Amino acid sequence: MRGYLITFEGPDGAGKTTVINEIIKQLPQSLQERTLVTREPGGSKISENIRTIILDPENKEMDDRTEALLYAAQRSQHVSEVIRPALATGKVVLSDRFIDSSLAYQGVGRNLGIEEVKQINDFGTGGLEPDLTIFLDLDPAVGLARIEKERAGQEDRLEQEKIDFHNKVYAGYRELFERYPDRIKKVDANLPIKDVAANSVKIIRKQLPDIFM
């Protein structure tokens, strides 16, 4: 039984974590038992430590290239320590963010270039790509308003960026959606969470039917 990597992407406040938790509830019990949920930045002890550095609001002087390299570093560790071993045992891995986040946030948002950022990430992950990516499509302003309502004053370093940055990131996601239409599928994240999750499960069933066998 082969493993599958399904990633969830979208702007800050799109509800990725909540949607993934709801998706788990909607999966058959047998599939729930072979599913591993993880996140980025993070997912392993070392990667979580790097996450703290990346997102700490105190690190305002962080250079854009440093940021991109730290994301690639935590991803390299995450893949080698968590994702590849899980895939090797036939797990279905659901990851809250993966390489597309770097391509959108650092490649486009930080103007470092999609291809340049992809190159350092491919080096770190050995070229591992998701079998399917769910893009939770939401206007960045709506997402940031959600964050402010839920945890005002506790935003991380990237969430604190100006709206112009978040709009560029969103444009980056749209570009990736158009560039990789076979892998990246869009879901309207304005809908209620249960509907967003149900629509995501429909896409998974259609794109990766073998998972449910």
Curated annotation (Swiss-Prot):
GO terms for cellular component: cytosol. One of its GO terms (biological process) is dTDP biosynthetic process. Belongs to the thymidylate kinase family. ATP binds at residues 10-17. Keywords: ATP-binding, Kinase, Nucleotide biosynthesis, Nucleotide-binding, Transferase. GO terms for molecular function: ATP binding; dTMP kinase activity. PROSITE patterns: THYMIDYLATE_KINASE. It is an enzyme of class 2 (transferase). The keyword Transferase applies. Phosphorylation of dTMP to form dTDP in both de novo and salvage pathways of dTTP synthesis. Its EC number is 2.7.4.9. Gene3D superfamilies: P-loop containing nucleotide triphosphate hydrolases. Pfam families: Thymidylate_kin. It comes from Lactobacillus johnsonii (strain CNCM I-12250 / La1 / NCC 533). This is Thymidylate kinase. SUPFAM superfamilies: P-loop containing nucleoside triphosphate hydrolases. It catalyses: dTMP + ATP = dTDP + ADP. NCBIfam families: DTMP_kinase.
